[in-house]
Amino acid sequence: MKTHNRRRTALRLAAAAFGLVLSMGAVAKDAQLLNVSYDPTRELYRDFNDAFARHWQATQGQKVAIETSHGGSGKQARAVIDGLEADVVTLALAYDIDSIAERARLFPANWQKRLPDNSAPYTSTIVFLVRKGNPKGIRDWPDLLKSGVSVITPNPKTSGGARWNYLAAWAYGLKIFRGDEAKTRNFVTALFRNVPVLDTGARGSTTTFVQRGIGDVLLAWENEAFLSIEELGPDKFDIVVPSLSILAEPPVALVDRNVDKHGTREVAQAYLQYLYSPEGQRIAARHYYRPRHPQHADPADIARFPQVELVTIEGVFGS
């Protein structure tokens, strides 16, 4: 009888130990996330991914491996629609994320209301990058239409940055032509006649201008302009801030159907929320994005951003 009891006790202990091992294994299992992002966020998310992974392991005891895919924002949106299983998307325009919601129904149409600031944790704008000394004397949008000026911008059909470029030029035209859309259209059309090549994404256009030496002026995300000077030196390029530009608000979203399929909802939600944290805001500013909460950033990083009149999509084009 005693032997039988001892055997039962041993079996219970073994079962408990086995259950503990399974439980520990479940806790220790690494999480994996795929962030499908737009073209010039490589450096930003390289640092942010490392910071979030450290934060998640310290607070949750779980390792997380984060892969990030980059490309023109419109092209990336189409990839997700066609089946690329992103856990989160961090794209250049709300329009691109709307298209995923509408065409693939991977998350609700009201996705933009689920995080603060219309789900845009940082902002940017459009500036001009010119060669050192500004040999073509480019100061504002009308200078881009001059004969002999070669303008580099990506393709608006595939690039979110290119669409911000287009909207900024259009907003300027509406201002100087007092709302006359026909004159504004002619203005923007003339600008694009000076574009010799249309790359698919913003980083490709930066490469065309910076490394291949094509063009007199690059219409650039502000962060791309700063990064070009950081990497190649202030003796190569100058930044020209136009009299008017646009408040670019690159949004982020959770891809509900995919995170539920992957079992990553909790970590993916935390990943996006961490963009709004003091650390996330510091990292954004460090990489030349304008943080929503500048009080969390290094004051030296904030001081780099020039003052510029910024219009919004809603203010110029309506909601």
Tell where the protein language model's regions lie, with residue ranges.
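Twin-arginine (Tat) signal peptide motif
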Residues: 2-13
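N-terminal signal peptide c-region/cleavage motif recognized by signal peptidases
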Residues: 23-26
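N-terminal segment of the mature folded domain
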Residues: 29-159, 299-302, 309, 314
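Short beta-strand->loop
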Residues: 36-38, 130-132, 150-177, 192-195, ...
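Periplasmic-binding protein-like
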Residues: 120-125, 185-192, 199-200, 232-265, ...
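Short helix-loop capping/hinge motifs at secondary-structure junctions, enriched
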Residues: 133-139, 158, 171-179, 258-266
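Ligand-binding pocket segment of bilobal, Venus flytrap-like solute-binding proteins
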Residues: 176-243
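Extracellular/periplasmic juxtamembrane helices and adjacent flexible linkers that interface
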Residues: 259-319
